[in-house]
């Protein structure tokens, strides 16, 4: 069984506190985009086997797809195994939920193969044990995600808007970015209410004005290339530009495909991983 595993971007990301166990409390608007990995799963007699077209992708318990399969088989006492083939298109360590969406897609395919009556809500319970972005990736679309990612409120879908996406030639550790964030020194927070209103009105310019990611407080200081990419996007006609998640991917939001194509061509001269895509 074959399925697409779609990436996500953040239209906003706010950190509003920190729990005693070290987890940060988040308030973020998440958006599915039409950039995806392909996941194919076949039922086998035993074990979990991961195949991938990229050598650098782990094929053991470090892979979230492996973890998803393990949790599913254990939870439902399934006495068989799966072979999972991953065709990677989403950049890794990029703030695009590449591993999380693969894990979510594994859960959905395994439901179809083994336990078709399981609800999405039940899948989200398993998903939260894998990672904070995985529950959102079960359904995707446009949603307000709160807590550590487990509180998901769907909003009007902000679909079919043009993006150019740049993944610089380095990765970032989500853990390191959050560890270097000083919550008490976040002085400007996203206006999430205004952003949701702009999305519901499909007001692209207002969405662009209200996009904000507080993790840029950490990354823009350390990685000057991210400032340069954001500036280049605006110079090349983007309505707004922001880092997605914990980075380092940066996207520009466009209202014109010709401008987006010119921007894409320009960015391709500097960066290897550049994509034109849309919100879905």
Swiss-Prot record:
InterPro entries xrefs: GHMP_kinase_C_dom, GHMP_kinase_C_sf, GHMP_kinase_N_dom, IspE, Ribosomal_Su5_D2-typ_SF, Ribsml_uS5_D2-typ_fold_subgr
Reactions accelerated catalytically: 4-CDP-2-C-methyl-D-erythritol + ATP = 4-CDP-2-C-methyl-D-erythritol 2-phosphate + ADP + H(+)
Sites where the protein binds ATP: 91-101
Biological process terms in GO annotation: isopentenyl diphosphate biosynthetic process, methylerythritol 4-phosphate pathway; terpenoid biosynthetic process
GO MF terms held by the record: 4-(cytidine 5'-diphospho)-2-C-methyl-D-erythritol kinase activity; ATP binding
One Pfam short name: GHMP_kinases_C
Protein name: 4-diphosphocytidyl-2-C-methyl-D-erythritol kinase
General function of this protein: Catalyzes the phosphorylation of the position 2 hydroxy group of 4-diphosphocytidyl-2C-methyl-D-erythritol.
Active site (record annotation): 8, 133
EC number: 2.7.1.148
UniProt keywords, alphabetically: ATP-binding, Isoprene biosynthesis, Kinase, Nucleotide-binding, Transferase
Family: Belongs to the GHMP kinase family. IspE subfamily.
Species name: Clostridium botulinum (strain Hall / ATCC 3502 / NCTC 13319 / Type A)
Taxonomic superkingdom: Bacteria
């Amino acid at each position: 069984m074959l399925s697409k595993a779609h990436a996500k971007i953040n239209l906003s990301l706010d950190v509003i506190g920190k729990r005693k166990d070290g987890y940060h409390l988040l308030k973020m608007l998440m958006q599915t985009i039409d950039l995806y990995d392909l996941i194919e799963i076949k039922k086998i007699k035993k074990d979990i086997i991961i195949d991938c077209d990229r050598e650098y992708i782990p094929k053991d318990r470090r892979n979230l797809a492996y973890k998803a399969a393990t949790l599913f088989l254990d939870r439902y006492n399934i006495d068989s195994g799966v072979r999972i083939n991953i065709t990677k298109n989403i950049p890794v360590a990029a703030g695009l939920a590449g591993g999380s969406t693969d894990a979510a897609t594994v859960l959905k395919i395994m439901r179809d193969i083994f336990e078709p009556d399981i609800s999405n809500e039940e899948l989200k319970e398993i998903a939260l044990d894998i990672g904070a972005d995985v529950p959102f990736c079960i359904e995707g679309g446009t949603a307000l995600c709160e807590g550590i990612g487990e509180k998901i409120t769907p909003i009007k879908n902000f679909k079919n808007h043009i993006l150019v996406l740049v993944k610089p030639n380095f990765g970032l550790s989500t853990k390191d970015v959050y560890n270097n964030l000083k919550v008490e020194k976040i002085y400007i927070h996203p206006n999430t209410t205004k952003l949701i209103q702009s999305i519901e009105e499909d007001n692209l310019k207002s969405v662009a004005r209200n996009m904000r990611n507080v993790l840029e407080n950490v990354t823009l200081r350390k990685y000057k290339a991210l400032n340069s990419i954001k500036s280049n996007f605006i110079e090349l006609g983007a309505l707004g530009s922001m880092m997605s998640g914990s980075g380092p991917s940066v996207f520009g939001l466009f209202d014109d495909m010709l401008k987006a194509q010119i921007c894409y061509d320009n960015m391709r001269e500097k960066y290897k991983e550049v994509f034109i895509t849309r919100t879905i």
